[in-house]
């Protein structure tokens, strides 16, 4: 998925730069995405991990999301802990 605008909240524009999904269960999925939030003051990139589900018409709905700063140390820590737990 290349640069897709998903939505605006107030004066913040969110753009999905890249996203990958994995399905699990009957109609659930996890999405890991790199996103950019842009305001009048500038922009910020971050990683988003979201859980969602598919509606009967196959459209997607997101339930929960966790944002992770785009910091190599934090990303490394999270990846290491996920593998070791």
Describe each PLM feature range:
Residues 15-20, 35, 81, 85:
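Compositionally biased, intrinsically disordered low-complexity segments
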Residues 20-22, 37, 73:
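Intrinsic disorder/low-complexity segments
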Residues 27-64:
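A short, structured beta-strand/loop element
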Residues 1-27:
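Negatively charged, low-complexity tracts enriched in Asp/Glu with abundant Ser/Thr
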Residues 2-5, 30-32, 47, 71:
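General helical secondary-structure elements
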């Amino acid at each position: 998925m290349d640069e897709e605008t998903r939505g605006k909240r107030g004066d913040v524009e969110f753009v999905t730069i890249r996203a990958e999904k994995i399905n699990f269960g009957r109609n659930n999925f996890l999405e890991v995405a790199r996103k950019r939030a842009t305001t009048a003051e500038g922009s910020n990139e971050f990683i988003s991990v979201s859980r969602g589900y598919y509606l009967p018409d196959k459209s997607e709905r997101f339930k929960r999301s966790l944002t992770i700063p785009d910091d190599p140390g934090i990303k490394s820590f999270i990846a290491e802990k996920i593998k070791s737990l």
